[in-house]
Amino acid sequence: MKLDNMFKKTRIVSRIQSHSAVRASRPEVPEGLLRKCNKCGAAIIAEDVKQGYYICPKCGGYFRVHAYRRIQMVIDEGTFEEWNQDLIGGNPVNYKGYPEKVQALQEKTGLKEAVVTGKGKINGRDTVIAVCDGRFLMASMGWAVGEKITRAVERATEEKLPVIIFACSGGARMQEEMCIRDRPDA
């Protein structure tokens, strides 16, 4: 046996131990405590982001705001009534894997579709609101998204109420595009 081989195992063990020591010396940060700004990369306390209306205090960059959080920020507390909750799109052109993808997003986001519509009060005044949520297929517009927004605007018109739409979208859903284009009223 060579003298080199005699100490090989010791070198490997010492490398593993030194790597573990470096990991152990890093401070543990509880999950969800910090948010990273996508614009400047700064780590900001999550509560500060929320209190600052989702604007980075370092660079002024914007954080994404989920639909129900946006409604909570705008509508008077306890006054929001959601409309058409059960209106969801389908898979009219039998796009492979689309139903599974939608179901996974529904479970992950707690949303049934990419837009939340309803009525609430802003400073005591009734208002109709539609809020898109980019977490759900980039808030792309499928049949149900268009229908929910249309119904909200029509109802607001009937009730003579103002409408606020927070729109953000990745475009039209290719999985439903043929169906939308072939609709008789399109």
Predicted regions, residues:
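Conserved P-loop NTPase/AAA+ ATPase motor core
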Residues: 98-117, 136-138, 160-161
